[in-house]
């Protein structure tokens, strides 16, 4: 039996109150431990039905001891390993690999004549019973990338002495920051030595930061299992629980894994983490797998648990298009028989990328390189020998039912448009074309000429093999609006497909999409000097193919011109997106604070009628009050789910700093509380999400919905420089916030404006009232530098002449102030990406 990753011949099953006595017995020596082990083995059956509370503890393989360089000891004839001075020998020892599994990488053959045979044999050897789809999830810096690389090296896909992150961290920004941003998939081929059975394990390495939770949710939709990693030194943290609940909602098999076992300095650390994991998740300690990617221990045991415990896919197998079969005479008996056995293709599209935004071309340079004989026209060879087309979109799919092959024409449920698949394959760890992707497999498909507007992450790709097959009509909108319950629901179409032989039409159902996420951080992106808005929009659109969680809206700023307002899942998400624009597309942008759209209704108008609302503009001729009945501000309902101990701090900030109004407070369980606030969208966008995360140390979650408009007291604030109105800096704000905004803008202008030969007065006005004022002092020439003696009146005469000259210059230079883009951006609170 394996307990906590330790092989032992029995189980130590004791009461919680008897645990100190149990520990003392084990410290007594090997004889005592053996006697206690045999005793527990005889009483195991009687204890299981006693109905009492028991604690499972792994048996000691040997008594725990301290060793140093000057003392050597032996236990049961075995010499303890020398770990150096003062190091601790833990009894939570990871077992040696049983060498039952061996990695068998299938690379493209060097002989072009063998390529067709290779593709066919690769697919035929993997029925659904031999496929496992697993996502690797964990908190930030808990060892996901290192463990994923160790698993690939165990499978002989990466060199044993390669650097960490050679596969998972493909993007340049990932390598510079040292974090995982995009979920990466790799198909691993393993052979069981005893039976020769070959397994296809699809590993998905996911990010750990809360800003990239959308990547995790999409990956879980394509999996039947999740490996939940926990750092043995750090224990259970915020994202550990978030990933656990996300996997639980998808009804996935969860494999608990302790990482970084090579860093353990005391068994108390392991026991504390095991107890914490069991108390917070309910996962039994005896099911935890102990691993160390650095020492390459526990990797085979983790693979063995994936094969043994993660259920295989359960889709419907079969061909999905007559083009996938040899030509048959229309109306022949063979063709009719084959048509009855056709299975409509149903595949979930859970990621997309282009050749410019994937990082695939340089992500696995250490992989074995084959010849580029398979590169066709219109494609360019990339590392690993794969063919990467230049024009088009790659889609990462999980095939639920049927088969997709090159040349298959698939239909997108959302748009109803049809597109032909040019190439299919697996990521191993680079793009390797195959003959087909069958039910249960995870792989890529390439669509030449596919546009971004036709791609929706979470959409269902399908085929209609015969005229009897029809698609269920879906409502217009994003296909990912419905919450997914489980990865595969093949039973939805089983009954209708079985009726196809009786003359009734078979309805192909869409796969339930995963829940979309809402942006919580907004920012305006404007092209830097020398960059056109069309170039920026094209780069953003291409990057949004690879990052669908970003929302895009058009903006028009009088100061900076046309721009884009983007919505992100956090500040780190925004910074990474800005860096990717610069690194991958060369687009330097100005990032400004978020803006919200205020509305107004005319006199005698109804504020509750959306048709009567009109957007407020600083150039509106009706401003400030001519013919206006009321000004409106957008409000949302923010829902916060937080551990109860952090509720007071979050509630205080929401009510005092973010103009929130509590609508509901409900205790979910003994540890969590749900609170709903009504607050302005502007306050939520300017930092409420960050406050919630920092106050709860990352454990709380925030969602918002129900956008409505409520009356507000708005004013127009004008900026005057040297008696000239600067229309580009005119803004609309709430009356009680006007003074704060005015001081910030005037202070920024004072710092950024260059001094001239005359004083520049800076003023902020609401109507005709000055609410803030500063002065940029003029340069003064030292006109008395050559006067070294004499009466003081000589210097005063020079100073008076200089003063009169300054006054004449000021009268001639009224209103002649030129502001460049950097000054305007600084006044609006912008930052430049360089």
Swiss-Prot record:
Its EC number is 3.6.5.-. Residues 363-385, 476-507 are annotated as: Disordered. It is found in: Mitochondrion inner membrane. Residues 129-314 form the tr-type G domain. CDD domains: lepA_C. One of its GO terms (cellular component) is mitochondrial inner membrane. It catalyses: GTP + H2O = GDP + phosphate + H(+). GO terms for molecular function: GTP binding; GTPase activity; mitochondrial ribosome binding. It is a peripheral membrane protein. This is Translation factor GUF1 homolog, mitochondrial. Residues 488-507 have a biased composition (Low complexity). Belongs to the TRAFAC class translation factor GTPase superfamily. Classic translation factor GTPase family. LepA subfamily. One of its GO terms (biological process) is translation. InterPro entries: EF-4 (IPR006297), EFG_III/V (IPR035647), EFG_V-like (IPR000640), LepA_C_sf (IPR038363), LepA_CTD (IPR013842), LepA_IV (IPR035654), P-loop_NTPase (IPR027417), Small_GTP-bd (IPR005225). GTP binds at residues 138-145, 205-209, 259-262. NCBIfam families: small_GTP. Residues 1-66 form a transit peptide.
